[in-house]
């Protein structure tokens, strides 16, 4: 969090993705890290020089929760999807979906562009989470910020027990934009 950054006596600069390139160019020195919202991973990766580490909030959150390795494995399963496979896209909150919604519009579009496959989708939100997961080839879950740790671990355990790969939005998006490896470079233990 920004509070953690301040407590570490570091400097935090917050900008819109459209302001990133100009901000980086104006700094007297390179930042230690760029952290982005997953939805703009592609643009931020293009605007961030390769010698500056870059990751996303959802990847950091997954690392903090201790489940990043399994989510990375789940993201890599995207590349094994075939025509007709069913993907569950699950959100922990029940926000009002708008045009351009990440879960119901952007992720399916990115999956189609990345895989070239005709996939089918099921969407859940809030407390909804299917008991039977065998019908899915992949589960893509939000970061779970509105779910307590116990609920998120329960969902991951259900997927593991069913043998279904599970990933989160940020890790999946990084994989589909070809920047998963780059977004994980900040973690020496992966």
Regions found by a protein language model. Give the residues of each.
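P-loop NTP-binding site
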Residues: 1-190
């Amino acid at each position: 969090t920004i509070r953690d950054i301040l407590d570490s006596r570091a400097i935090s600069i917050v900008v819109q993705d459209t302001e990133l390139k100009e901000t980086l160019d104006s700094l007297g020195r390179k930042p230690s890290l760029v952290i982005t919202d997953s939805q703009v991973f592609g643009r931020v990766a293009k605007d961030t020089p390769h010698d500056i580490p870059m990751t996303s909030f959802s990847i950091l959150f997954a690392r903090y929760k201790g489940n990043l390795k399994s989510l990375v494995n789940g993201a890599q399963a995207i590349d094994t999807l075939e025509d007709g496979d069913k993907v569950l896209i699950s959100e922990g909150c029940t926000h009002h979906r708008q045009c351009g919604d990440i879960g119901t519009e952007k992720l399916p579009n990115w999956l189609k562009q990345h895989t070239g496959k005709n996939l089918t989708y099921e969407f859940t939100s809030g407390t909804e989470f299917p008991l039977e997961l065998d019908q899915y080839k992949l589960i893509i879950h939000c970061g779970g910020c509105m779910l307590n740790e116990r609920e998120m671990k329960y969902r991951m355990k259900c997927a593991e027990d069913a043998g279904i790969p599970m990933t989160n939005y940020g890790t999946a998006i990084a994989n589909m934009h070809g920047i998963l490896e780059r977004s994980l470079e900040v973690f020496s233990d992966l």
